[in-house]
Amino acid sequence: MPELIEQSKIISGNVCGLPQLHKLRQDNCGLYSHIRGIPISYGNVDLLTTGVRAFVEEGIALCQPDQVHICDGSEQENKVLIKSLLEAGTIVPLPKYDNCWLARTNPADVARVESRTFICTERREETIPTPVEGVKGTLGNWISPSDMDAAVQQRFPGCMKGRTMYVVPFSMGPVGSPLSKIGIELTDSAYVVASMRIMTRMGAAVLRQLAKKEEFVRALHSVGAPANGQVEQPSWPCDPERTIILHKPAENLIVSYGSGYGGNSLLGKKCFALRIGSTIAKQEGWLAEHMLILGITDPKGEKKYITAAFPSACGKTNLAMLNPSLANYKVECVGDDIAWMKFDSQGVLRAINPENGFFGVAPGTSMETNPIAMNTVFKNTIFTNVASTSDGGVFWEGMESSLAPNVQITDWLGKPWTKDSGKPAAHPNSRFCTPAAQCPIIDEAWEDPAGVPISAMLFGGRRPAGVPLIYEARDWTHGVFIGAAMRSEATAAAEHKGKVIMHDPFAMRPFFGYNFGDYVAHWLSMEKRGQVPKIFHVNWFRKSAEGKFMWPGYGENSRVLEWILRRVNGESCYVDSAIGHIPAEGALNLDGMKDKVDVKEIFSLPKEFWSQEVKDIRTYFESQVGADLPASIYQQLDELSSRVDNL
């Protein structure tokens, strides 16, 4: 990163690529309450390991905070944070619930910013495939080391003047688990600290773990301030014009500026758990994936664990918290968003949820769609950009049936709202940040340091036409091809364009930490490392010619999981098809279903549709990935093409 003062130079052993400035380096003179001459407002500097302390000192030199707060994760500390957030007007209390708070952000800071999210490597091709000339690449953004340095130099010097720098030690995964990794985030946002306390294992226990083995990901975050010095909303400072999120995998470094929104500021989540996580996983021979993890127990008491990768708005959280309609089946939740998976010494693929909470999209969550989530979120939760009610509660689209009469609603912008307002009360990307341990169906092994054994992996998306309810990959390579070819319906940014089918390989398109072609090769290599699970593709969203969903979804999805369990147990309850194994006639248990399902139609494979699908996948692979895609994936596409020709 940039040199900030004349003749400063980066010395060997620099822990994070931030400048180590010889002129400014000084001993702390044994003072407990200062670090580099900056007062410690909370916490004990003696708990910092050598590497953490060096990182903090570099952050102080760069950002120039007024004081430093070393987080311990305690209840007492949380009260201090909540008090400061209340005083700043960042949050308001929700007296209807137990220890719940509502934050309203600057309206310009409401979501992840893909166009400003970069991976920094020496060579561009390490980060992204080279698309065909004239085609815009969609598999990540690369930035050179010199441009990253310049971006930091333009934004960070002095950005924490007048503010507190919080030192946030956090563990992704149970503290001490062989599958876990540690991070240190430096931030000037108390909202981030309070949220990280929910989303990660945060505090003194992490520093004690680092004292045993000092390996950690460095994460630097500032909400920033506009270059003109005018803060629009003092309760939510940010700098939307200059927001940037940078990752440097070679140095396990994340740098984020200008946004307080969760995906850009809670750096343990997508930045660490997926982007940096996937690069570490490649080096160490494991997988860091955008997947839920659930446990399902059949009527005989036999339990299996399944992971599933779906793009956003395709029901990951709903499946992770499934309430099965099939009698005597039980689903339990290990995680709803991210899975880290590694083979154990016996070659069994084991997964942990590296997170400690749920950062879920609120709108659409209701007692009808996800009663388990609704029974999770109304205590110890930070809500962001949902609407509030006059009786001290919250509201979002989907909660209409639970509204008491005569309750007034204030929308996410702080304005009065009625159902005739013509716009949503809650922002479409509004969130709840809630502890996972509160989930009524949290799995008993959700914090098992060894992880849970994975028997099946699901890929899926929102496909209104052509794609059957469920099919199984023929083998591992075919399964990897299915993941690479994933597509899902998304609403185009411009409404008049209507719905478009977007490519979202492995549901990871915004989160790859390195070249997608190398990522696919890494997935293919897993077969040589241990016992790989079976792979399936599901589609809950196929529609009839009349535009009605052909499958009722929600609890009825347990019927699909039952068939998956039968296949995992080796039952030959399938027939082969052009695209993979589908349930044999009568093999999908439909007993007792209220809705009549046209089984023939929901498993039909229209030749015209699949011929076009093959063409679209080929165009995507050739234009976006080209020679970087392993030859065996092109071979899978050729084989699919010839099978479709014979439909």
UniProtKB/Swiss-Prot annotation:
Its cofactor is Mn(2+). One of its GO terms (cellular component) is cytosol. GO terms for biological process: cellular response to glucose stimulus; gluconeogenesis; glycerol biosynthetic process; glycerol biosynthetic process from pyruvate; oxaloacetate metabolic process; propionate catabolic process; response to lipid; response to starvation. Mn(2+) binds at residues 270, 290, 337. CDD domains: PEPCK_GTP. Substrate binds at residues 112, 261-263, 312, 429-431. Gene3D superfamilies: 3.90.228.20, Phosphoenolpyruvate Carboxykinase, domain 1, Phosphoenolpyruvate Carboxykinase, domain 2. Keywords: Decarboxylase, Gluconeogenesis, GTP-binding, Lyase, Manganese, Metal-binding, Nucleotide-binding. It catalyses: oxaloacetate + GTP = phosphoenolpyruvate + GDP + CO2. GTP binds at residues 313-318, 431, 462, 554-557. One of its GO terms (molecular function) is manganese ion binding. Belongs to the phosphoenolpyruvate carboxykinase [GTP] family. Catalyzes the conversion of oxaloacetate (OAA) to phosphoenolpyruvate (PEP), the rate-limiting step in the metabolic pathway that produces glucose from lactate and other precursors derived from the citric acid cycle. Monomer. This is Phosphoenolpyruvate carboxykinase [GTP]. It comes from Drosophila melanogaster (Fruit fly). The gene is Pepck1.
